[in-house]
């Protein structure tokens, strides 16, 4: 039974939800807007690794992308926009077969949001009703149960589809399982996590397991509705603690108004939509269990081998995949970048960032397959 009734949930969403720089029908963020003082990147790294603070309690200032960064993003778009449009269409076609309407897309902030908006449009264009929310899930702390229960109170649980951009090591999938694996509403079938690229081999549905340059993976808020990653300064509410009185206590985020002139969230969606609408008929996305398992085995072997080779006790210091490796350079204190190929077009931005940050690079060939890039975070404390 829902914690609040449908009318109360609708009222709460309309009152407290927002859409950032997206159109209101494209996504509703179930996050509370906040302001906290930014933490210097090096100090944040020290606090994380010392255990003094969890990463979700702090955030560093997000700077405007440089002209070179935007130039490399445009190259990524030229390379990948056709593939992205095709894979969005393939995923949407599978979703309309698998779920009854309306499909309730629940994207994980931030990486899932651009894909969620694209899927929203593709599902609508297939003639099916769809709604889209952006909520928080935090490694080690779980999904935002208050936000999720608000959605369930309004729409039920049967047609919920969780959306993320890709899987790196599979940490968010593990967090989803830990949060909802014993929830009777979701028992009996795999948790429906949809991603573009399931490199870690742990998603319910993916367009591929390739580590490729997903354009939305190499920008931050300026392609995700001008919001920060989610923030949770205090203790998180567990599933059992949600009541009608605290169901509005969603995780938080910052709106980055200072980056408004650089925001391309809408242009990105429009551009991919225009390509998608001109596509030839596409086959439905299929992510076979055998394919998924092979991917999972290979990716786990790489992570475990690197942990041994570089004496890494905390595997959160290993950031595999082009997208994760790039984000780690921008947001963390990198120690080393491992590349599969020295001249890979898809790692051009990553290589540019290593030059700026003076991060060492090693080309290691197929040792890191299926990944094409991995960033190792600098060790500042234990492990």
UniProtKB/Swiss-Prot annotation:
Any single GO BP term: protein autoprocessing
EC id: 3.4.22.-
Listed GO MF terms: cysteine-type peptidase activity
Pfam families: PELOTA_1, StiP
Disruption phenotype: Deletion of this gene causes hypersensitivity to tellurite, altered population dynamics during long term batch culture, and, most strikingly, dramatic alteration of normal cell morphology.
Regulation of catalytic or functional activity: Is inhibited by bromopyruvate in vitro. Activity is not affected by the presence of tellurite.
InterPro entries in alphabetical order: PELOTA_dom, StiP-like, StiP_N
Keywords assigned: Autocatalytic cleavage, Hydrolase, Protease, Thiol protease
PTM info: Is probably processed via an autocatalytic removal of a proregion of about 100 amino acids.
Enzyme type, top EC level: hydrolase
Protein induction: Highly induced by starvation during long-term stationary phase, while shows very low expression during exponential growth.
Family: Belongs to the cysteine protease StiP family.
Function: Cysteine protease that may play a role in regulating cell morphology in response to stressful conditions which likely cause oxidative damage. Appears to catalyze its own cleavage, which probably leads to its activation.
Protein name (record): Cysteine protease StiP
Organism of this sequence: Acinetobacter baylyi (strain ATCC 33305 / BD413 / ADP1)
Gene (name only): stiP
